[in-house]
C-alpha cells in the first residue's frame, strides 16, 4: 500500500467541486460522528448575540440630579425620601450636583424618582 501525504490529500480536496466537497464532508461527519456545522453555527450565533444588547430595551437605569433649581430645600427633602440619606448627606448630594441618586433601578422606579424631583424643582436625567 502506498503512503499518501497530507499535501496530496489537500490537493485532491482542492480540486473537488462544491457538490463533491459537500458529499465528502457528510461522509466524514457520519464516519467520525462529528458535525462540521456546529462551530460555524456557534460563530454565526455569536455575531447577532453581540449586536442584540444594543437593540434590547435597557432594564436598569440611573437617576442623576443635574441641578437643584430654585427650591433647594424641597429637592433635599425628596432626595432624603428617595435615598434614605440623612439631612447632611442629602444636602451634600444636592450641593454636589450633578450627582447620581439611584443606580441600576427599574424604569418605573427611575421615572417615579424623576417625577418627584422635577415636581420639587430639580433638573433630573435618567440614563
From Swiss-Prot:
Sample GO molecular function, one term: structural constituent of ribosome
Source organism, top-level taxon: Bacteria
Entry-linked Gene3D superfamilies: 3.30.1390.10, Single helix bin (1.20.5.710)
Modified residues (N6-methyllysine): 77, 88
Gene Ontology cellular component annotations, sorted alphabetically: cytosolic large ribosomal subunit
InterPro entries hit by this protein: Ribosomal_bL12, Ribosomal_bL12_C, Ribosomal_bL12_C/ClpS-like, Ribosomal_bL12_oligo, Ribosomal_bL12_oligo_N_sf
Pfam family, any one: Ribosomal_L12
Residues spanning the membrane: none
Keywords: Methylation, Ribonucleoprotein, Ribosomal protein
Role description: Forms part of the ribosomal stalk which helps the ribosome interact with GTP-bound translation factors. Is thus essential for accurate translation.
Binding partners and assembly: Homodimer. Part of the ribosomal stalk of the 50S ribosomal subunit. Forms a multimeric L10(L12)X complex, where L10 forms an elongated spine to which 2 to 4 L12 dimers bind in a sequential fashion. Binds GTP-bound translation factors.
Family indicated by similarity: Belongs to the bacterial ribosomal protein bL12 family.
Protein name: Large ribosomal subunit protein bL12
Gene this protein is translated from: rplL
Amino acid at each position: 500500500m502506498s503512503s499518501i501525504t497530507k499535501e496530496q490529500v489537500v490537493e485532491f480536496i482542492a480540486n473537488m467541486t462544491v457538490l463533491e466537497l459537500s458529499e465528502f464532508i457528510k461522509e466524514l461527519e457520519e464516519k467520525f460522528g462529528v458535525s462540521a456545522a456546529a462551530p460555524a453555527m456557534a460563530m454565526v450565533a455569536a455575531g447577532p448575540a453581540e449586536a442584540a444588547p444594543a437593540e434590547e430595551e435597557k432594564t436598569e437605569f440611573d437617576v442623576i440630579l443635574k441641578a437643584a433649581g430654585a427650591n433647594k430645600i424641597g429637592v433635599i427633602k425628596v432626595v432624603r425620601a428617595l435615598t434614605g440619606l440623612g439631612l447632611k448627606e442629602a444636602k451634600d448630594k444636592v450641593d454636589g450636583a450633578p450627582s447620581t441618586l439611584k443606580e441600576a433601578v427599574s424604569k418605573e422606579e427611575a421615572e417615579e424618582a424623576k417625577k418627584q424631583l422635577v415636581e420639587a424643582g430639580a433638573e433630573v436625567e435618567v440614563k
